[in-house]
Amino acid sequence: MTSTKQHKKVILVGDGAVGSSYAFALVNQGIAQELGIIEIPQLHEKAVGDALDLSHALAFTSPKKIYAAKYEDCADADLVVITAGAPQKPGETRLDLVGKNLAINKSIVTQVVASGFDGIFLVAANPVDVLTYSTWKFSGFPKERVIGSGTSLDSARFRQALAEKLDVDARSVHAYIMGEHGDSEFAVWSHANIAGVNLEEFLKDTQNVQEAELIELFEGVRDAAYTIINKKGATYYGIAVALARITKAILDDENAVLPLSVFQEGQYGVKNVFIGQPAVVGAHGIVRPVNIPLNDAETQKMQASAKELQAIIDEAWKNPEFQAASKN
């Protein structure tokens, strides 16, 4: 894939709530010129129906070829986006999904690679950090071309929550959630700022915002998925738009800085896991990680989060079905 290619092709694997919402976001924002949607055989007609339904919006947006795809259609795609997986149920953590979704992930990645695909994988199925790692292993692709959605949605939730608390536009809030996309994630308070003004300084001019309120705010961000799942059964709109944003950064070779599941090679004392941190992303995938200088407490949280992910990966890879991939 090159940044000069004019016809941009995306293949979506998984046409559930997240996948179909992502497809709608691509159509609505005019991203890519071709979108193929892959589903399991028993749901193929749903993909056909969604492709038809989405095509009826094109007169209002921009031209795009949309169709129910097969794995061989991945061969010349720029980007394969994986949203397929068992959904998270009420009371279930993202890490509880590992066993079910690793098997699904292996089947998908094996078939995509067999098509001759040589683009970029973008993973959104949960637990996303673990499944980004498994996609890397099962594909044998360079780590730069395997990307997880990471903490992109968590960071957006954090920015929106701070914006509401401080009565400012969320686009003027610059703040990150790092670590696992899940229970061990953490807020990078030390570098949060409003239009370049450090949050601590900004709060000096803001009445009635106490530290306890900020802690509660973060907890609301961390637990947002559970809240939504308990109320409506699933989360999909926020992550769909996050995926569309990542897709645009890749297809347009933006070199945008986004918080993604990025392979760790010693930054923050962490190695051999994919975990959420900011990174520069463009047409060839991850250009480089952006290593925010965390304070000691934040560094410890990053290491603890990575340790949890590593334990899950180590346990999963005891399964003989997945051990062969470790040799890649």
Curated annotation (Swiss-Prot):
Q: Where in the cell is it found?
A: Cytoplasm
The residues that the entry says bind substrate are 88, 94, 126-129, 154-157, 235
Q: Which residues carry this modification: Phosphotyrosine?
A: 226
One annotated GO molecular function is: L-lactate dehydrogenase activity
- Active site (UniProt): 181 (proton acceptor)
Report any Pfam family annotated for this entry: Ldh_1_N
User: Which InterPro entries has this protein been placed in?
Assistant: L-lactate/malate_DH, L-lactate_DH, L-lactate_DH_AS, Lactate/malate_DH_C, Lactate/malate_DH_N, Lactate_DH/Glyco_Ohase_4_C, NAD(P)-bd_dom_sf
CDD domains reported in the protein's UniProt record: HicDH_like
Q: Which BP terms from GO are recorded?
A: glycolytic process; lactate metabolic process
GO CC terms of this entry: cytoplasm
| NCBIfam families for the chain | L-LDH-NAD, PRK00066.1
Regarding protein family, the annotation reads: Belongs to the LDH/MDH superfamily. LDH family.
Q: What's the name of the protein? A: L-lactate dehydrogenase
